[in-house]
């Protein structure tokens, strides 16, 4: 399969290749919106770099998905090194999980070029990545759509750009493009937002970390407004509208398993995906969802990253959050482009009121 880069993809690839070929020793970041084709950028960088390149992925599912895309672009001098994926092949280009690599560090001494997908997940204070970076000869570039980390301070939790935290792993952004730019060029799907929440989040306490809402307090607010009734009711309306065409597929983000179970008990052809769903069952459900055999998927704490389904046209947000990154990742599931698609964001959680349209979010690097 041959491919042609869009202008912003070429600019991102050029920036990475320039850094890898330079004598710079800093760790850099490339920021590309969800749906911008990050996997293609990674593939192009890999094809242009001389010598070994290791590409770290945050999960088995994303690793397998992006590795398959790499090979679909005609790049075959590549391998997978991941215990969870059941493969330990080292090649010039190696897609890997950090845990598997750190158990056999000596195998990877010759890898001096490093890409890290979803790099906002890297802990700058401790962990396996920090140990891996201690080799000063390595050049590291991270890629993300959400370059933020939640940091604690005297005033409570604060969202900071990952190049401005203390300590920090990444020092500078070498390339970024805005969501609004890609929308204007037709590279992302247009979105329509429906703000219909009944929740009063001022009644909900923040958890002990300051990062998000307290679960017990949030559950009490859910029960006060009977959010379960609203989730079921709006899902039925989306499946059987009084006018217009029913939505192609509906992905619902819930906070607790009980909302998902309520949906599954009242909505025919609704499946549940959670962290405890067996891998084979999860794969079967998502295949059925993409094939159109399953119309509704209620997911609990998963499918916020790496779920690639461009035809998806509707998400229902029933998971309140204080995390801008999480909000963006959830909306990002429906912003991927598909011909003739208008993505719908049906918000029962108050997230839209807190953060607004993702199209209006801007990355300011200065």
Q: Model-found features: residue ranges?
A:
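Conserved pre-motif I regulatory segment
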Residues: 1-31
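Walker A/P-loop
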Residues: 22-45, 249, 253, 273, ...
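Conserved Walker A/P-loop ATP-binding site and its immediately adjacent core
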Residues: 34, 40-72, 255-258
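Conserved helicase ATPase core of P-loop NTP-dependent helicases/translocases
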Residues: 64, 78-90, 251, 259-263, ...
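Conserved RecA-like P-loop NTPase helicase motor core
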Residues: 99-105, 275-363
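Conserved interdomain linker/interface between the two RecA-like ATPase lobes of SF2 helicase motors
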Residues: 171-251
């Amino acid at each position: 399969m041959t491919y042609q880069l869009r202008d912003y993809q070429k600019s991102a690839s050029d920036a990475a290749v320039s850094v890898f070929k330079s004598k710079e020793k800093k760790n850099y970041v490339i920021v590309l919106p969800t749906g911008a084709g990050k996997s293609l950028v990674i593939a192009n960088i890999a094809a242009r770099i001389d010598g070994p390149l290791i590409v770290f992925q945050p999960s088995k599912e994303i690793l397998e998905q992006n590795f398959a895309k790499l090979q679909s672009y005609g790049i075959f001098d590549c391998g997978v090194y991941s215990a969870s994926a059941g493969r330990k092949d080292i090649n010039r280009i190696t897609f890997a999980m950090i845990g598997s690599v750190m158990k056999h560090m000596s195998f990877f001494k010759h890898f001096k070029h490093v890409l890290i997908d979803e790099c906002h997940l890297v802990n700058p204070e401790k962990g396996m990545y920090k140990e891996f970076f201690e080799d000063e000869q390595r050049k590291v570039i991270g890629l993300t759509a959400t370059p933020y980390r939640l940091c604690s301070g005297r005033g409570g939790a604060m969202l900071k750009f990952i190049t401005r935290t203390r300590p920090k792993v990444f020092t500078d952004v070498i390339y970024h493009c805005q969501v609004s730019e890609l929308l204007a060029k037709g590279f992302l799907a247009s979105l329509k937002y429906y703000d219909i929440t009944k929740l009063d989040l001022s009644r909900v306490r923040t958890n002990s970390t300051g990062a998000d809402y307290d679960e017990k307090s949030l559950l009490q607010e859910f029960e006060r407004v009977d959010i379960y009734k609203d989730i079921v009711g709006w899902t039925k309306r989306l499946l059987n509208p009084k006018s217009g065409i029913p939505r192609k597929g509906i992905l619902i983000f819930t906070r607790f398993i009980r909302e998902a179970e309520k949906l599954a008990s009242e909505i025919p052809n609704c499946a549940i995906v959670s962290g405890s769903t067996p891998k084979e069952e999860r794969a079967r459900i998502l295949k059925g969802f993409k094939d159109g055999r399953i119309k509704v998927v209620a997911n609990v704490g998963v499918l916020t990253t790496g779920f690639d389904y461009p035809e998806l046209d509707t998400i229902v947000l029933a998971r309140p959050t204080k995390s801008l990154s999480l909000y963006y990742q959830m909306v990002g599931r429906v912003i991927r482009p598909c011909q003739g698609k208008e993505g719908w964001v049906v918000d029962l959680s108050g997230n839209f009121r807190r953060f607004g349209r993702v199209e209006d979010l801007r990355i300011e690097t200065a």
